[in-house]
A protein has these predicted regions:
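Expand to "…catalyze enediolate/carbanion chemistry for C-C bond making/breaking, isomerization
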Residues: 1-269
Length: 269
């Protein structure tokens, strides 16, 4: 029933929003649950990302979760486990509107990411939209050309040093900062380190480079940190995820039931 009613052409695409100067706020799903995916979308996020890198999600789960997100009014994207064309192609064939691709550190790796996301002549993606073609009246080849978003991750010092060259690769729609891995690469340990000038300077350098190149700057965040990231020029910001919201909500409700202050804070992981 979900497949019957979820249609990939029924909403404005992420690329169209970005091309019109818009900002997108997203949710993150790490649990293998179409219900969780749909609930996250119904909360009102512009996109919902299914995490197949660090989440507990297999491909068969992705196939069910993508139409659930669309049914909830969201735009499904997925994070690939690695910059590997077969995996990226399968996520797109399942109906993802875009793919976040980890650990893109060089121009060569950025070109590989684009090739995996694009059909010829712009790339080398294999054509076989067996699943996704059922959910659009438009030829999927044409829809993908106009809508699929290629989103390499910037999460190391090496990637920051190469940021201008990476952004110059044709076919990149947005980049996505992984703040925890970036912090580790900076020698700060995992997490957000807004107290460190090295960390915030890197965030500002990335967003400024994106503005110059006309590429959307994206970042993993928390609800509390999202206003700061927007102020720094990030236009694709993931504000929370299913596990984080569940942990925060359960802790808060339990504290209220006990008549206590929870002291709970939202987190990225």
């Amino acid at each position: 029933m979900v497949l019957e009613h979820a249609r990939i052409g029924d909403m404005q695409g992420l690329r169209e929003i970005w091309n019109n100067g818009g900002t997108t706020l997203g949710g993150w799903v790490s649990l293998a649950s179409p219900v969780t995916a749909e609930v996250t979308a119904r909360a009102g996020f512009d996109y919902v990302c299914i995490d197949t890198q660090h989440g507990a999600v297999e491909y068969s789960d992705v196939v069910a979760m993508i139409p659930a997100i669309e049914l909830g009014g969201g735009r499904p994207i997925a994070r690939a486990p690695w910059n590997e064309p077969g995996i990226i192609g399968k996520l797109l064939d399942a109906g993802a509107h875009g793919v976040i691709i980890p650990m893109v550190n060089t121009v060569e790796e950025a070109r590989a990411a684009v090739r995996a996301c694009r059909y010829a002549p712009d790339g080398a993606r294999s054509s076989g939209p067996t699943l996704v073609q059922m959910r659009t009246d438009r030829p999927y080849f044409d829809w993908a050309h106009d809508n699929v978003a290629c989103i390499p991750m910037i999460e190391t010092v090496q990637a920051v040093e190469n940021i201008d060259a990476i952004l110059a690769v044709p076919g990149i729609d947005a980049i996505y900062v992984g703040p925890s891995d970036l912090s580790i690469s900076l020698g700060l340990g995992p997490g957000n380190h807004d107290e460190s000038a090295a960390f915030t300077d890197a965030l500002d350098l990335i967003s400024a480079a994106c503005a110059r190149a006309g590429v959307v700057a994206g970042i993993h965040s928390t609800g509390a940190l999202t206003p700061d990231r927007l102020r720094r020029g990030y236009r694709m910001v993931t504000a929370t995820g299913d596990l984080q919201a569940m942990k925060f909500g359960l802790s808060t409700e339990l504290a209220q039931a006990r008549g206590e202050s929870s002291g709970a804070e939202s987190s990225m992981y």
